[in-house]
Amino acid sequence: MSLSRLSIDAFRNIDSAQLAPGAGLNLIYGHNGSGKTSILEAIYFLGMGRSFRSHLSQRVIQNDADCLTLFAVAEGQAGDSRIGLRRHRSGDTEVKIDGEKVKRLSQLAEALPIQVITPESFSLLFEGPSARRQFIDWGAFHASKQFHLAWMNTRRILKQRNQLLRDGASYEHIAFWDKELIRYALEVTAIRNDYVGSLNGVLKGIIGEFLPDVDIRVSFTRGWDSKTDFSELLQSQYARDLAIGHTVSGPHKADLRLRVGNLPAQDALSRGQLKLLVCALRIAQGKLLKQQIDKHSIYLVDDLPSELDAKHRQLLLKELIDTGAQLFVTAIEPSAIVDSLPVPPDRMFHVQAGRVTQTK
């Protein structure tokens, strides 16, 4: 999957821009605040229906505009897809794929698998289990057609169960929902566990290249004691759940644990090593996606040189290029990227005050 055409209108500080990206590495350069990160953000918005920089999507619409408009032509093995999105200041969103209206944003994610590597990518390690569950679920969603529905049903039932707990319902009333919760929770957990197992096989080789002297162990925790039957646990923890008004254990508490020796990776590694670890995780996801469903991710890499020396910058770029995926990489100075590449970028774009000019 790669974008052969990209149009951006009224997005952040970009009035209007049309790009014809290459299928390989696209280097976007310019001063801080010029709008280069906004191009990455626009691609992400088109693929996810939201920003990777702000949950308040209205902020991405230019102040004097009523809406933003994004359009792309995506090339894949099955042919080209035309994807369009319009977000109004009211919050209403219109999405079309090949002229057909899209009802669920998950259809966007399926059409455009996107990986993001930014200075904020550390959140995967530092912001608690939620970010790591999202990481697992991105892969599980693409790997299994059953995952999305199973997870949506799990969330729906958990919401109903938690409301009953807050209402002080007896366990007899909650037991009905627990039967359904157990069914979907076990399905979600099995898919997640299989996915992390597959990811581990790909990840080891990449970590071996990035951090050859560090023994990193990656494991999946399902959200409750692995030795305890989930049905028995829900019943035995009913009094506790009732007291605090929500379900303490379950797939909504799952996590991806990364450890070096007896320490969490975030306590054992330097910031540069942590950045390489996060990059390795993202690259592994993209490689596994290609193996499982024969589809490339699109990589959005913002401020790649940050906290990496020339050797590791070169190594990271090589691994990214070796995925065969389309890459969008930003830098203040193009030489910071070009000097680390074995071959020139496919395309280069200069951004100044929201204006985009192709220079190669």
UniProtKB/Swiss-Prot annotation:
<dbReference type="GO" id="GO:0006260">
    <property type="term" value="P:DNA replication"/>
</dbReference>
<keyword id="KW-0742">SOS response</keyword>
<keyword id="KW-0238">DNA-binding</keyword>
<dbReference type="InterPro" id="IPR042174">
    <property type="entry name" value="RecF_2"/>
</dbReference>
<dbReference type="GO" id="GO:0005737">
    <property type="term" value="C:cytoplasm"/>
</dbReference>
<keyword id="KW-0234">DNA repair</keyword>
<comment type="similarity">
    <text>Belongs to the RecF family.</text>
</comment>
<protein>
    <recommendedName>
        <fullName>DNA replication and repair protein RecF</fullName>
    </recommendedName>
</protein>
<dbReference type="InterPro" id="IPR001238">
    <property type="entry name" value="DNA-binding_RecF"/>
</dbReference>
<dbReference type="InterPro" id="IPR003395">
    <property type="entry name" value="RecF/RecN/SMC_N"/>
</dbReference>
<keyword id="KW-0963">Cytoplasm</keyword>
<feature type="binding site">
    <location>
        <begin position="30"/>
        <end position="37"/>
    </location>
    <ligand>
        <name>ATP</name>
    </ligand>
</feature>
<dbReference type="GO" id="GO:0003697">
    <property type="term" value="F:single-stranded DNA binding"/>
</dbReference>
<keyword id="KW-0067">ATP-binding</keyword>
<keyword id="KW-0547">Nucleotide-binding</keyword>
<dbReference type="InterPro" id="IPR018078">
    <property type="entry name" value="DNA-binding_RecF_CS"/>
</dbReference>
<keyword id="KW-0235">DNA replication</keyword>
<dbReference type="GO" id="GO:0009432">
    <property type="term" value="P:SOS response"/>
</dbReference>
<dbReference type="GO" id="GO:0005524">
    <property type="term" value="F:ATP binding"/>
</dbReference>
<dbReference type="InterPro" id="IPR027417">
    <property type="entry name" value="P-loop_NTPase"/>
</dbReference>
<dbReference type="GO" id="GO:0000731">
    <property type="term" value="P:DNA synthesis involved in DNA repair"/>
</dbReference>
<keyword id="KW-0227">DNA damage</keyword>
<dbReference type="Pfam" id="PF02463">
    <property type="entry name" value="SMC_N"/>
</dbReference>
<dbReference type="GO" id="GO:0006302">
    <property type="term" value="P:double-strand break repair"/>
</dbReference>
<comment type="function">
    <text>The RecF protein is involved in DNA metabolism; it is required for DNA replication and normal SOS inducibility. RecF binds preferentially to single-stranded, linear DNA. It also seems to bind ATP.</text>
</comment>
